[in-house]
Amino acid sequence: LQAKIDAAADNATITLDSDTTITETLVITGKTLTLDLNGCTLRMTGTGSVLKVSGRATLTITDSRPQNPHTGSDAGLPAGGVITGGKADKGGGILLDGGCTLKLTGGCITDCHAIGTVGGGVVLNGDTAILYMSGTARIENCTAGETWGANAIFNSGTMYADGGTVDGTVNNQGTIRLSEGAAAETVFNGTVYNRSAGTIKAGRYNETVENRGTITGGTFCGGVTDDGGTIEDGAYETVKFNSDNGAQAKEEKVLRGQKVSNPAAPTKSGHTFTGWYLGDEKYNFDTPVTAPLTLTAKWEKVPSSGGYYYYHPTTDTKADDTKGSPKTADPGVALYAALSLLS
């Protein structure tokens, strides 16, 4: 396979036609190349990264048969193209040097290991290294000497989190962002350590982000632990509570992906509060907030109380009534009846 890589022209595509075993790291240098895993397994049995990208090269990894099952000794591997078995000081799966670009659009990097502390799956080795992750690409079941050293990805460059899934810890000392016009975001299913030099601008984080750096965007379903970092306004959504009782609407900022707290019930004279509504639906406060919201209070009128009122004078100004004379009116006696109507 290395001979094919060396002989390939710039912008060529190499397609695996069978499961492939290597004993030394495959090196792509000084050219733009696409590797189609084609549902096959690329397995390292020696020591070193499975792939190394150097010399300002660009490597795109695709998988034209993502549902292809594996059999025999590989039966336990995920379906589709797989990169596996790497064992290196750093970057067990792929080591990406500064000035190089890696585009992961398909396939799975699994069961790769960093013997040292850094990056079992992929390492961006320098601030000019660039990773684009999108499509059905996955990184899973990789390890490093220390979990903070990133089982899955160690990033000191720029990662464009345009899709795909990362299972395992990530150490970010560079930037995680979104490509302009990207329709999807990478899902991170492990703890992300955002170091002091790190910036997170995009991505969906289902586990905790430990933040020493800067967060300007993203969706944080697992929450953020403040470790001396900064979270800017772009990472928050505004929830407006319109109580519809004459009081000014209240606003609350919520970290995107977190839940807004159910506030104390408002009051309105002559009415009973029935809940907060988003449009015509009663709002579920267990729902993560991912966009600006306006919640409106709904009210029911309280039935007004009613009854009869009878008034009798305490004195009578007439000494006697003329017997047998009909009374058409008596100014000293009043009878008032009020009937309540439900409204």
What are these regions (language model features)?
Residues 1-17:
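Acidic Gly/Asp/Thr-rich repetitive segments characteristic of extracellular carbohydrate-active
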Residues 4, 16, 35, 61, ...:
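Extracellular/surface recognition and adhesion modules
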Residues 21-34, 42-63, 83-102, 116, ...:
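Extracellular beta-strand-rich solenoid/capping regions of secreted or surface-exposed proteins
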Residues 39-47, 64-90, 105-118, 134-151, ...:
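Beta-strand-rich solenoid/repeat architectures in extracellular/passenger domains
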Residues 11, 17-19, 32, 39, ...:
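Tight coil/turn sites that cap or link beta-strands
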Residues 332-343:
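A cross-kingdom C-terminal cell-surface attachment/processing module
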Residues 232-311, 316-319:
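Secondary-structure capping and domain/repeat boundary segments
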Residues 318-328:
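Juxtamembrane low-complexity tails/linkers enriched in Ser/Thr-Pro and polybasic
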